[in-house]
């Protein structure tokens, strides 16, 4: 596996490759990331991964400098998965001059849910993903469903800019007790780790209630889930039932007609903020 930091060197290495499958990451890789590499290999060849901790998507109260950087360990994991190239640019490689042009997602998708609680986050995500697509020029790119809103935003961005890349969704990888794998899990203490699977259990309870029959009050279901998490010591930002296609709340008519739904949540357990979702 070649490790490349320069955009020009990356383009030279990939010249003539027209079936590149790309997996962008911020490093600190775990089994969930590695599953994305395996899925990428099913859709293209060669597989290219990137590791770049993107300052643009960190808010003023989010510590960019403390984000875990484990490059050597990540390199070994990617080598074991047969990745062809790791693009690991420095900040000066990626942004040799200040990034004055940004990609701003539409408000109806970028300023809700995660976007409401992390203002500017998706603008930073879209900007770096667009730039990575320009650097790598993949035929397919794999994004995990764990970051469901990010997947929807990137998919819409690719479509509206007519980018020649297919966005492939990857199922969330979970621990045996249901906790979604995440780089943030390392911050959970022993007691918190034992409590953490309750978040996924709560999503299942929401789904079971929604599927339980006609006349379900979705707002009441959301409020009940929030209250139950709060009673256990969580600090939830949201539990929200949305349509899968555009992440808008379903109307009564859409719900009655069986519109595909997803329940999404973000909540703090101690100092660790976890996100998860479950399709209904």
UniProtKB/Swiss-Prot annotation:
Q: Which catalysed reactions does the entry list for this protein? A: (R)-pantoate + beta-alanine + ATP = (R)-pantothenate + AMP + diphosphate + H(+)
Instruction: Tell me the residue numbers annotated for binding beta-alanine.
Output: 57
> Which residues participate directly in catalysis?
33 (proton donor)
Keyword Ribosomal protein attached? no
Q: Which pathway is this protein assigned to?
A: Cofactor biosynthesis; (R)-pantothenate biosynthesis; (R)-pantothenate from (R)-pantoate and beta-alanine: step 1/1
Recorded GO terms, molecular function? Answer: ATP binding; pantoate-beta-alanine ligase activity
What InterPro entries is this protein classified in? Cyt_trans-like (IPR004821), Pantoate_ligase (IPR003721), Pantoate_ligase_C (IPR042176), Rossmann-like_a/b/a_fold (IPR014729)
Residues reported to bind ATP = 26-33, 144-147, 173, 181-184
UniProt GO BP: pantothenate biosynthetic process
Entry EC number(s): 6.3.2.1
Return the similarity comment. Answer: Belongs to the pantothenate synthetase family.
The record's HAMAP family line, in alphabetical order, gives: PanC
Q: What is this protein called?
A: Pantothenate synthetase
The gene is panC
């Amino acid at each position: 596996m070649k490790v490349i930091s320069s955009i020009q060197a990356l383009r030279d290495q990939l010249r003539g490759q027209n079936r590149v499958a790309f997996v962008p990451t911020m490093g600190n890789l775990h089994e969930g990331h590695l599953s994305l590499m395996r899925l990428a290999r099913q859709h293209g060849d060669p597989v290219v991964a990137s590791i770049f901790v993107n300052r643009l998507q960190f808010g003023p109260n989010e510590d960019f400098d403390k984000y875990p950087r484990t490059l050597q360990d990540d390199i070994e994991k990617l080598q074991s998965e047969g990745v062809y190239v790791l693009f690991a640019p420095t900040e000066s490689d990626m942004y040799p001059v200040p990034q004055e042009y940004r990609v701003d997602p539409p408000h109806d998708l970028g300023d809700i849910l995660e976007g409401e609680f992390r203002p500017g986050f998706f603008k930073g995500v879209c900007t770096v993903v667009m730039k990575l697509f320009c650097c790598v020029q993949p035929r397919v790119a794999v994004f995990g469903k764990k970051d469901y809103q990010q997947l929807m935003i990137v998919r819409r961005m690719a479509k509206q800019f007519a980018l020649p890349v297919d966005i492939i969704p990857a199922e969330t990888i979970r621990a045996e007790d249901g906790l979604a794998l995440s780089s943030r899990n390392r911050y959970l203490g022993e007691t918190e780790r034992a409590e953490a699977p309750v978040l996924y259990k709560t999503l299942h309870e929401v789904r079971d209630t929604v599927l339980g029959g006609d006349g379900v009050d979705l707002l009441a279901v959301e409020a009940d889930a929030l209250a139950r998490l709060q009673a256990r010591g969580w600090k939830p930002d949201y539990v929200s039932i949305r349509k899968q296609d555009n992440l808008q709340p379903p109307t009564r008519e859409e719900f009655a007609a069986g519109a595909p739904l997803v329940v999404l949540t973000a909540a703090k357990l101690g100092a660790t903020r976890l996100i998860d979702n479950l399709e209904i």
